[in-house]
């Protein structure tokens, strides 16, 4: 794949992103003032003036090494964690690893990457004390894709159809979106084809969709959607094109929910100087994401060196899409959007993921605020960010 520059000096359209506050409401209330340079920096250089106390920590990733986590790999490779006197072990995820469960264990990793609704569910039903300390993704990357020649045009066309989803909490946006149409799963149990659909647990790939075994497939814009575009259309002999597909972007359906965030256990944060360790970890990680925004090609190489299973072309696509989920953010990277938080809670309650509003203890913006205060000379908002254009390659090679 080829990627064009993704940062230009132009005025970015304003997006509504605000910070956290409040006590027991379902949303933070005010947005802190964040200083941000309008000029990008190719290598964020801010580091502590004196060496802080050394610490060794672990970060549980949601999946295997890929550009979804490029900022953390970059923070390690570029020495940003070392600048904070941190030794960081990046723990691979996978189909059998549930990060919010691993991270909730008393002896679990100090930091965890997970989606907000999964953690809210774990807090309510599993006694987790995970806290969102840095909301890295400002937008959801979840799609559902259908074949354009099927005549299906949107979620309310899926009654009586086979709808692929992933489990372990990855399905929440899809099932919530279909719920807005008045549809529920259960068609496979002699259900009503006018108000129910067959919920098919999809493998973490697009094989069933490409074989037309399901009518709609869940896909991340940075991963499985690209896998379809990297596959050969047997009719034409060429790669599938976007016009071959009908795409439901759950952001536009107002059921998207907050995704990748850095979580830490409240009990761990309360011990010793662990909160300071968290500030340093978040600061170094943000430097890694700034580096990947400004140097996407270098970050792709870093991810490939980490042992990713998919090729350079696929990781280039993914890096481009991941950057677009993070940047721009009106109030700065890592700051929680109160409107999106409210939507996440509303959709989670409506879908039965949680039954009550989460307490204010579910998030703590003070850590990311302190971390970014030490990066005031950086372009924390991504002002001028422009998403690049990437051309899919066969098999993502």
Give residue ranges: language-model regions.
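Conserved C-terminal helix/tail region of periplasmic/extracytoplasmic solute-binding proteins
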Residues: 342-397
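Secondary-structure end/capping motifs
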Residues: 272-355
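N-terminal low-complexity, Pro/Thr/Ser-rich intrinsically disordered segments
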Residues: 33-60
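Sec-dependent bacterial lipoprotein signal peptides
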Residues: 1-18
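Short, surface-exposed acidic
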Residues: 185-197, 237-245, 275-276, 307-323, ...
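Pocket-lining segment of extracytoplasmic ligand-binding domains
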Residues: 117, 150, 204-208, 212-308
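Bacterial lipoprotein signal-peptidase II cleavage site
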Residues: 17, 21-30
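Short, glycine-/small- and polar/acidic-enriched structural segments
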Residues: 51-203, 211, 215-222, 242, ...
